Amino acid sequence: GSVSHMTASILMEAGYKTGLYTSPHLKDFRERIRLNGKMIPKKKIVGFIERHNEFINSLKPSFFEMTVAMAFDFFAEAKTEIAVIETGLGGRLDSTNIITPVLSVITNIGHDHMDLLGDTLQKIACEKAGIIKEKIPVVIGETSPELQDIFISKASESKSEIKFAERNFRCFLDNFDPVAGERGFHIRELNTGRTFIGTIPMGGDCQARNLQTLFQAFQILKNIFKVTDNHIIAGIRNTVRNTGLQGRWQVLGREPLIISDTGHNKEGIEFTIRQILKISRRKLHFVIGFVNDKDLGSVLPLFPADAEYYFAKASVQRALDSEILMNEASKYNLKGRAFPDVKTALDKALSCSSPEDIIFVGGSTFIVAEVV
């Protein structure tokens, strides 16, 4: 999500009429489909359904398939100059994969959607490699020795130029400033020694690898679009303002420090907790909840026992019951109370906190959606 939003923001800074399709949404369905940062108008959604109602009823596409079709229809009608399209899950069989892009980007491989993509990172990598198209360049953001051969093989088979961002760029992040709500970075192009300096409004440590991926992508996109280094730096700095991105290490309060993040797979949660533990504060409070198909055994051991827990249930059908979560968490020495909803859990965390404490809200996108 972050890379998609930053890419769109940069292209907007360069003056292009830019479409952006991402998922899921946090508050409003229309967040998924944006043109120059503005959400699709409600009348366009209604118009699409009315025009295609008969076809939709006969074909019965999935919710995601219908939203992808709606996005493409909207972008075509608006004569969008370029669209940034984020896959839903995997890649090979994803409905976004019907397009032929000018560039494919695979940010990283994590333990996500394992019931659909496969139970090993190798299987997941094979699915994600499915977005590599014939003679279309591809950027790999983060990989490992056991996975890179999968991408190299697929790129070779497709006659596609392949670039590994972490081989060509190195990003260093300054300490996160919760007051300013942003973070300084400098990124070095390894083969030339050139350095780029700027600020990013998303404070997570994971943004270092995202920035490496982004700079690698624009090294290629600069050959297609009129994008300067200044556009890139400004686009990164203005991502939240330009595209409305939320829930990425988002500061919701400062005394106590309240941070929310949508990271929900093992890798994302691990990154987030590691960063939280580096912050010098008195006490930690976690307001967390998960979806009911989450492999709790892979994520609960990542949380520190030396913290207070407020187990919450998001107001969606897929949400895991907070009592069940509390009982499972106790197996990993995570102690706390269960709450029927996110607001009650957060209110309790606030009442139990001092100004020097940290409250983290997360575990699933649905939990974060109720606090941002």
Where are the regions a protein language model picked out?
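C-terminal helical cap/extension that packs against the catalytic core
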Residues: 144-154, 159-163, 257-260, 266, ...
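ATP-dependent carboxylate-amine ligase catalytic core
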Residues: 13-99, 115-117, 145-146
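Beta-strand->loop->alpha-helix junctions that form or flank phosphate-binding loops
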Residues: 21-23, 141-142, 156-177, 200-205, ...
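Nucleotide phosphate-binding/pyrophosphate-handling subdomain across enzymes
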Residues: 77, 82-87, 95-105, 110-114, ...
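Extended acidic/charged loop-beta regions that coordinate divalent cations
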Residues: 24, 70-116, 148-195
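Active-site-proximal loop/hinge segments that shape catalytic or ion-binding/gating pockets
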Residues: 364
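Membrane-proximal helix-turn-helix segments that form the acceptor-binding/catalytic region
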Residues: 125-134
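Hydrophobic positions on the alpha1 helix immediately C-terminal to the Walker A/P-loop
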Residues: 2-6
